[in-house]
Amino acid sequence: MAVKGFRPTTPTRREMTMCTFEEITTSTPEKSLLVSLKKSGGRNANGKITVRHIGGGAKRKYRVIDFKRNKDNISAKVVSIEYDPNRTAFIALVVYADGEKRYMIAPVGLKVGDTVVSGPESDIKVGNCLPIRNIPVGTVIHNIELAPGKGAQLVRSAGNSAQLMAKEGDYSQVRLPSGEVRYIRVECRATIGVVSNQTNEIVNIGKAGRKRHMGVRPTVRGSVMNPNDHPHGGGEGRSPIGHPSPRTPWGKPALGYKTRKNKKYSDRFIVKRRHDK
């Protein structure tokens, strides 16, 4: 899919780019698969900000996505490829032979009229979902489960894909988009192909207002705050931060400080970390 620019009617429009959405076939979602979303503004039940930089944005409905793909051996026909405001990837509306409708993450190359199937006996074809045990080594996959039957949790955003590197016993080795190689049980399911909307990463937002439409509020530098708001705040004019190294708003070391727990259960499943050369 291509990326289009705009005439420079304003300085920000000069740099702004947008997807052309050529793959999208309809602008009307399936009503039976919509759920209302209530905005939190980043606040918890007590009204306190627990996540910064969240607020405003256009209204949106949540599209219920089938991440489990557990309707085995029943073919489903792709009816439409749609835009989803809740994720970077496009979604596909599929209708099963028994009449049930579901949304799934659309992979690259999936078109209206195509047929997809789930189950251990499915063909190795784009959009089909099957256990890793039945997928050949070297296959490009996405929508990967971490626990059998739980639903896909890995490799779901636009343009992403993982590769099946090896299979041994009850576990397989999968190389994730970050470069991390991880053990995943062979009973876990994955979908064949690459996630759609590959040009998403080269889109230039261009202006602050477009980010506000997405529900993202400004990020203020700590050095321009007051000392009671941030460890970098205070001083006359452009002052140094007053610390040997940068700090987070809560006083913890920033920039390079490892935040992952030292003794995490899932450490045993990581074969190669993403930072290892």
Curated annotation (Swiss-Prot):
Coiled coil regions in record: none
SUPFAM superfamilies, per database record: Nucleic acid-binding proteins, Translation proteins SH3-like domain
GO biological process entries: cytoplasmic translation
Keywords from the UniProt entry: Ribonucleoprotein, Ribosomal protein, RNA-binding, rRNA-binding
Pfam families: Ribosomal_L2, Ribosomal_L2_C
InterPro entries per record: NA-bd_OB-fold, Rib_uL2_dom2, Ribosomal_uL2, Ribosomal_uL2_bac/org-type, Ribosomal_uL2_C, Ribosomal_uL2_CS, Ribosomal_uL2_dom3, Ribosomal_uL2_RNA-bd_dom
GO cellular component: large ribosomal subunit
Region spans: Disordered: 219-277
Single GO MF descriptor: transferase activity
HAMAP family per the UniProt record, alphabetical: Ribosomal_uL2_B
Family: Belongs to the universal ribosomal protein uL2 family.
Function, as annotated: One of the primary rRNA binding proteins. Required for association of the 30S and 50S subunits to form the 70S ribosome, for tRNA binding and peptide bond formation. It has been suggested to have peptidyltransferase activity; this is somewhat controversial. Makes several contacts with the 16S rRNA in the 70S ribosome.
Subunit structure, as described in the record: Part of the 50S ribosomal subunit. Forms a bridge to the 30S subunit in the 70S ribosome.
Protein's name in the database: Large ribosomal subunit protein uL2
